[in-house]
Amino acid sequence: MMGRRGSSWCRWWVALLVLAVAADAVGCTSVSYDDRSLVIDGQRRIILSGSIHYPRSTPEMWPDLIKKAKEGGLDAIETYIFWNGHEPHRRQYNFEGNYDVVRFFKEIQNAGMYAILRIGPYICGEWNYGGLPAWLRDIPGMQFRLHNEPFENEMETFTTLIVNKMKDSKMFAEQGGPIILAQIENEYGNIMGKLNNNQSASEYIHWCADMANKQNVGVPWIMCQQDDDVPHNVVNTCNGFYCHDWFPNRTGIPKIWTENWTGWFKAWDKPDFHRSAEDIAFAVAMFFQKRGSLQNYYMYHGGTNFGRTSGGPYITTSYDYDAPLDEYGNLRQPKYGHLKELHSVLKSMEKTLVHGEYFDTNYGDNITVTKYTLDSSSACFINNRFDDKDVNVTLDGATHLLPAWSVSILPDCKTVAFNSAKIKTQTSVMVKKPNTAEQEQESLKWSWMPENLSPFMTDEKGNFRKNELLEQIVTSTDQSDYLWYRTSLNHKGEGSYKLYVNTTGHELYAFVNGKLIGKNHSADGDFVFQLESPVKLHDGKNYISLLSATVGLKNYGPSFEKMPTGIVGGPVKLIDSNGTAIDLSNSSWSYKAGLASEYRQIHLDKPGYKWNGNNGTIPINRPFTWYKATFEAPSGEDAVVVDLLGLNKGVAWVNGNNLGRYWPSYTAAEMAGCHRCDYRGAFQAEGDGTRCLTGCGEPSQRYYHVPRSFLAAGEPNTLLLFEEAGGDPSGVALRTVVPGAVCTSGEAGDAVTLSCGGGHAVSSVDVASFGVGRGRCGGYEGGCESKAAYEAFTAACVGKESCTVEITGAFAGAGCLSGVLTVQATC
């Protein structure tokens, strides 16, 4: 009897356990690969992905960004993991706010998308110090990204922390989560041969792969830009503007493009880079023509370098990147829509592309036809790599005209469904509109307060003293942009000198006996510069205070962490009229990081702190000054920016949230690419090949993003500015980002769409002409006007958010030679 009960109970328990295991397995996804593609749940898949970096937006923005990515035809979201954001101090972690990475991945999962986890933990990304914490420099024996125990111990500790967080939240595919790939290290192959220690570099990269695989994440590990000395247990991948001619280092693994650069980052002294929708589509189409399987746009949404996160040095606060979604999350048209059309066509051919046999036929040096066949179906690509001429290509008896630098895709090898150079999507021009809050005054009313510099005008009360000029990052652990170097000397009688300081900057302010006597900053990418200023010493003790400031730390290159910053080594000299120098380099220097108001956290407006502001005449061009104003949040849901034109350089906060560094006084350089734009030919971000640049000769960044979640509706919001270099706040204003003009074009038989989006309606149709030859969207001129087209679009579109009109032969005007109709409307 007891035996039967025991046996029955055992069978019941086993059955319950089986059910529990089965229930736990529901939704679990297997991920493997072969030479054609990733294999997800036993099915070969083409994956279209886009990079969205969670710290470069806010949690409130994430669902909308991810939704738009999915609606744009993407399957996956790719992101780096930002080590120095998550571990700003050793073993002190931050996973809150826009660093809540688990929440970000859950948003991806909720949208029904896959995710690609790029741990690094070195990431480059134009992020401060490439994502590596500055405190690593404090650890004895530390060598970044080489085979040494101090670095590898810290790297493994952080990697394991991130992996365990993802496992605990069931984020990996085998747990039912969205993560289908994980990356270790980043672009190591670009620097591996430049480290002067090939053995250590090789041992390190193989250690990385072994360490990663021991994490048992259940999905493949990848390494990007690792074409040589590739560990056997990772998949190497490509980064670049074009990856069609690249193939992995061995057979049996798929062709993956982890970074297709949709534009380029911006530096304070450079104009805005624009990569055309035609060229990106051309690159993507060629990649899949030549056996590509997974392609990721870097970036799909660039976002904002809030706080002190921008790298470089000299990377701007905006990380817009000319991505399909702009810095604020708006659709960048026609780039977003043109790529969406491409994605739809590629997905319609997925089975044929990943299973079919393929045949390449060359029609000369720059023309290739690729045919994929599977059973009775076929799909074809025709590419024309000539950048200066259109060509006719005959395929299966039919002739197809290909514009220069384009790819045509024929899902049935008969009819062209997509050509990379022929854009059907509208163009949208976004504008900055004045604040429309009901109670908002015409201009902001300011109070101001000087930064308290007096504690730093002597060489007393420092953190420590040293008889040498030290490197800034090591000394400050990058806890502030600012580091004070202070010393004193006794002088007999009065004397006139020239103060000479050699520094690796990035900025320098010099004070003698409490007075600002000179300032300078590095220019043209050369971060070694000199400050020379006349100075008078008085009889007795004289104080010299030098304030060195950084503008983002270097994030890329071999041994980039060894690039010195600050007045390291100097020399610092006082030179008299005869050329005789007093060398102060080995004097007793007192060091202190940061400014007084940083220590008091004035930006947080804490209850115990009283703002001792002056409400009288507002000083302008006064360095080291705080300005404060309140404003009503702009009405509606449009993105908000603050226009800081008139200011020089500093930092801005809204309601205690750091918007980032500002520097609108820095003018973008004039470059040859500012005056020409042609999608044809290989895109370059450097050298003679640059083109399609805008903003030359203008403020490098005038507008700064204020996310809606930073604002309080219906109550006063606080804007706080720290003006470091001296500017004029009188023109500062809040604005909203709205569609200004929308434009489209087409020929007879085409159905074209105009959409303002975001709840905005078309207010007028301004142009409806054939053969428009001058201007850009928002400023088109000329052409042969069509009254019939104007009336049709006015009737269909005005007062509506979106409208679609078919172009008919009835629109053609008498004597109009062109068959292409251009329509421009105002939102």
From Swiss-Prot:
Which residues are named in the active-site annotation? 187 (proton donor), 259 (nucleophile)
Signal sequence annotation: 1-25
Query: What are the protein's UniProt keywords?
Result: Apoplast, Glycoprotein, Glycosidase, Hydrolase, Secreted, Signal
Q: Where in the cell is it found?
A: Secreted, Extracellular space, Apoplast
Q: Which residues form the SUEL-type lectin domain?
A: 746-827
Which Gene3D superfamilies does the record cross-reference, listed alphabetically?
Galactose-binding domain-like, Glycosidases
What Pfam families does this protein map onto? BetaGal_gal-bd (PF21467), GHD (PF17834), Glyco_hydro_35 (PF01301), SUEL_Lectin (PF02140)
Which residues does the record list as glycosylated? 198, 249, 260, 366, 392, 502, 520, 578, 586, 615
**Reactions catalysed:** Hydrolysis of terminal non-reducing beta-D-galactose residues in beta-D-galactosides
Record GO cellular component, one term = apoplast
* InterPro entries, per database record: BetaGal_gal-bd (IPR048913), Galactose-bd-like_sf (IPR008979), GHD (IPR041392), Gly_Hdrlase_35_cat (IPR031330), Glyco_hydro_35_CS (IPR019801), Glycoside_Hdrlase_35 (IPR001944), Glycoside_hydrolase_SF (IPR017853), Lectin_gal-bd_dom (IPR000922)
Determine the domain of life of the protein's source. Answer: Eukaryota
What EC designation does it have?
3.2.1.23
Tell me where it mainly resides. secreted
Q: Which GO terms describe its molecular function?
A: beta-galactosidase activity; carbohydrate binding
Top EC class for this record:
hydrolase
What's a single GO BP term from this record?
Answer: plant-type cell wall modification
> Which CDD domains does its entry note?
Gal_Rha_Lectin_BGal
Q: Which family does it belong to?
A: Belongs to the glycosyl hydrolase 35 family.
Which PANTHER family does the entry mention?
Answer: BETA-GALACTOSIDASE RELATED (PTHR23421)
Its protein name is: Beta-galactosidase 1
Species in which this protein is naturally found? Oryza sativa subsp. japonica
Q: What is the lineage of its organism?
A: Eukaryota, Viridiplantae, Streptophyta, Embryophyta, Tracheophyta
